[in-house]
Structures are given as C-alpha cells and as structure tokens.
Amino acid sequence: IKPEDIEKELTAKWVKEDSFVPIKKIAKVKELDLLALDPDETIVEEQKRQEKLLKISGVMISDVEVREYPLKDEAAHLVGYVQNVTAEDLEKHAGEGYTNASVIGKTGLEGVYEKELKGENGCKIYIADSEGKEKEQLAYKIVKDGKDIKLTIDADLQAQLYKNFKSDKSCSIAMNPFTGEVLAMVSTPSYDTNAFIMGMSKKQWDRLNKDKKQPLYNRFRQVWCPGSTFKPVIAAIGLQSEAFTGTDNFGNEGHSWQKDKTWGTYHVTTLHTYSPVILKNALIYSDNIYFAKAALKIGTEEMERSLSMLGFHSSIPFEIMMAESKFSNNKHIQSEVGLADTGYGQGQVLVNPLHLACIYTSFCNDGNVLKPYLLYKENAKAEQWISEVFSKSVSQEVLEGIKSVVNDSHGTGYAIHRKDMILAGKTGTAEIKESQSDTTGTELGWFAVMTPDKKNKKPILIVSMVEDVKGIGGSGYVVKKDKAVLDKWFGKN
C-alpha cells in the first residue's frame, strides 16, 4: 500500500479523532491452521506479517464479514466472485436496492444468480432526541436474506480434477450420464477468487492478467477442435442415416489416402493399419481415413442437417452461457475436403466440452441427448434436450464400439480400462496448424470416458481437454490424468 493511499483514507471527511479507518482487507489466519502438524508455509508467513503490523503505532486488525470461497482456485471459473459496485453497476441496476457499499456478482454463478443471492437490505427511519437516541419509529423494513443455492457439483471431484490438471492449460466437464447432473466444471490454470474479495494490488493484477497461461480465461465455456472424440458422433450419424453399416468394409488404404486427384496434394493420414476395416475396428484404432470416407458417404446435406439437429450453431440449455459449437464458420461445409476433415473432428469443427459430453449421453440413453443442469433437485429425473436423435440400435452399436476403445488391448484408451467394471470412451488429438505441411502447429489432447452401465453406483462421464500436448503424449497424456481421477472416484482396482 502506498503512503499516499493511506493518507487519502485517513483524511476522508467522515474520519474523526477516534475513528478506526479501514485501509485494506487481509485474510484472517485461523488458529486451527497454525496448529496443524505441518502448517502451510504461506499461513505461517502471513501470521508473522500480521504480528509485525500490530507493532506499528496506531495499527489495529479488526474482524469483518466478507464473502469467502472455500474451494478457491478449484472452482474459480465456475463459482466466480463478487466485487464492490461501480458507478456503471449503480446506473445499470438503479432502483434495485444497490448502494455505494454494495457488492455484486461479477463472474460465474455469482453473476448468474446475483438476484437470488443478493437479498434485500433492511432499514429503519426514526426521530431521534437531542442525544441521538431513538424517540419515535416512523418506518421499518426487515432484512431479507438471499436464497441458498445448492448445486449438483461434487466438491471432492471438482478438487481432484483441478489437482490433476492444475499445471496444464485445460478444461474438464464431469456429468452423471443418466441424469444430466453436472458434477464438476474445471478450467486450469486458475486463480484464488478470495484475492478479488480482499483487493489486489496493481502488481498482483498485472501478474495474473499478463500470465501467458491465461488463468483468468474460462476454457470450459469455449469451443475447441475436438479431433477424434468426434468420431463416435460421425459413426452414429452415418448409421442413423443408413449411409453405411457397421460391417461395411471400407478397404485398407495404408497410412495415407485421398479420394482422387482433384484434392491436389491433400491427403488424409492415419497411424495404424488393420483388418477388417469396419466401424468397430476404426474406433479402436482411431482411423482418420475410415471416418473421412464415412463423412463423404454421409454427404454434406445430411451432415449439416444431423449436426444442426444435435445442437450445433445453437445455444446449450444451461445455467451458464456457453459458446455455441459449430461445424463451419458460416453454417455450411464449403468443400469435399472440408467434409472429409469434419469426419474425424478437424476442418472447421469446434465443439464446447459440455456439449460434447451431452452428445455422449445419447449413447447410453437409447439415442436421447440429456439436458445438463447445475441446480440440485431431490429425486431428479433426466430431462431430454434432444429426443430420439439416434435409434436405440444405433446408440447401442456406437456404445459397443467405444467400449472396445477402452477394453480392447489395441484401443487408444486401453490405459484406463478397469477389471472391476466396463468403461466406454474415445481419445482425440486435434491438430492446430496453418496447413497440412505445417510442422510448427500445436495439438489439443482430448479424452471422453463414461460408465455405460446404469447399475453402476457412482455413474460418471468425464470430458477433458488439454492444450499443447504435442511431444508429451498427445491424448495419452489426458488418459493418464483422467485415470488418476477415476481411481480416486471408484478406488483403485
């Protein structure tokens, strides 16, 4: 704190000789934290700092009530924070009971549910006698507390996902695949929301705002290139539209393929060869060539129609506003190559992680896409966002395919398979580069995994995305991280 800032507060018009003048809010050091067997070093240092402050003549530390966020960094982008109202806030919310001393929800759920959480101030108007004591009450308005809001979020799961991914530029969504309850929403790196309550110095703000990893950026609200996690969606569209069957053999093309010479130098590449080249194997080996061919068989018109029906270029019905998934920059797939690239989650396809998780719910709910929700409901029943988008037989066939991705030893998600239950999932590595020959581009690593059995006592669906996985294992890096989360969720098998 600068001396001139302190002087400014001390010389305010309301200040009297015996006034306690608030200068800055600081975190209270709790005695229990200091008595821990291995107390946090930052807490110990803060205690020493406060002891030094109290040795300064005229300095006092007084307790005040402020909003506290116990999950701190773990749920910053989800919960958000409140701040003191600005002149703009007062103008925008004129007549809604805000004063210069009010706080208001700025981001996250604090902003979404500001009206419900705010409550109403109380007041009393009275006539005072010459000594300032109440003589006659003229009017009285009782304080009305804000509502308590209970979420579907599992705090332990939220914390575990954050812990596992906190050093990455990532986002994760966790849902109950049979109800639509959202169990976790994590964006990393993150920040301590309590810092906004206590007040930040310019230096602190600049450090946070200029961090190259962008801790203030909410990644789970954005759209990203999905890579191979999109292949089960293409599989379902192809089967539903009868463009092909699961047993159609697309033929072995080796590691590189193009439809014909009209594609110029452009080729679709894949990593593995196998036989027969049918849907189940294409999912197991994550074959780009198979799904490029699948997209061409589906055709542009059917692809656009089906993806639109799945909620692309539309808003997600959810408490927090999410960016809209899209299959093209202008709602139309422009070329044959663009259509082929769409088949394996490249091209201009961008998907919101929550949206992708919702689409995956259709594979274990007879082809119905469930509506996600955050507000807890007793004895909640699943609500359908998009009904019967796929038939029961189609969703079952795709589900069997993505079970194999995790449980077949050749599957790209085999590292997460368990002996005590069947999981289903799909890996994805999306390339972000200027051209096919560009070797300087980055990669996004994806993994979607779920418990497809309704009898599972702890059902879960996780979609995780990590930026910059090139050179550190691609999607395998994400599989490893999610495995640790599931081991904690279920217990190691």
Outline where the language-model segments fall:
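Alpha-helix C-terminal capping segments
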Residues: 49-54, 161-166, 374
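Short, gly/Ser/Thr-rich active-site loops of penicillin-recognizing serine hydrolases
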Residues: 382-384, 479-493
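Envelope-exposed proteins and targeting segments
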Residues: 57, 74-77, 145-149, 168-170, ...
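Conserved, well-ordered alpha-helix/loop/beta-strand core segments that scaffold catalytic motifs
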Residues: 130-171
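Membrane-proximal periplasmic segments of bacterial cell-envelope enzymes
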Residues: 1-134, 142, 170-171, 177, ...
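Beta-lactamase-like hydrolase cores
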Residues: 13, 156-176, 181, 189-194
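Short, charged, low-complexity patches
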Residues: 106, 356, 474-486
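Beta-lactam-recognizing serine transpeptidase/beta-lactamase-like catalytic domain environment
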Residues: 129-138, 178-229, 233-466, 474
